[in-house]
Design a protein with these regions (language model features):
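Conserved loop-to-helix N-cap of the C-terminal "lid" that shapes the substrate pocket in Rossmann-like
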Residues: 33, 63-71
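Short C-terminal tail/terminal secondary-structure segment
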Residues: 75, 86-105
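Active-site helix of classical SDR
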Residues: 9, 17
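Alpha-helical segment proximal to the catalytic Tyr-Lys
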Residues: 22-26, 83
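Conserved catalytic loop/helix region of short-chain dehydrogenase/reductase
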Residues: 1-5, 28
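A glycine/serine/threonine-rich, flexible loop-to-helix segment
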Residues: 26, 36-59, 69, 99-105
Length: 105
């Protein structure tokens, strides 16, 4: 089944993050987003019949994400360490996006 609307909504989040960040940074409001890759969820579970083994095999980190992975990013963005991060969409996917062009075989 095509996922055009899902893909469009993801792209909208990326763009909205940049636009809001540019507008709100003047008021000292920082806007950033997290783009999670494969994490256990109802949506992903339904797509793979709750068998994440194939996703884990294809992921450079050999696993799906955990709540702690997202929590670490949230803590970073909410702390002084993230105080200079503005308008970023941080991908948390175990390296899938960054290594995709190297795995075209």
């Amino acid at each position: 089944m095509p996922t055009f609307s899902y893909s469009a909504s993801k792209a909208a989040v990326h763009h909205l993050t940049r636009v809001l960040a540019a507008q709100l940074v003047k008021e000292n409001i920082l806007v950033n987003a997290i783009a999670p890759g494969p994490y256990p969820s109802n949506m992903l579970g339904a797509a793979v019949n709750h068998d994440y083994s194939e996703i884990e095999k294809r992921n450079p980190r050999k696993r799906v994400g955990t709540p702690e992975d997202i929590a670490g990013l949230v803590i970073f963005l909410c702390s002084r360490a993230g105080a200079y991060t503005v308008g970023e969409t941080i991908t948390s996917d175990g390296g899938i996006v960054k290594t995709a062009s190297h795995n075209l075989s």
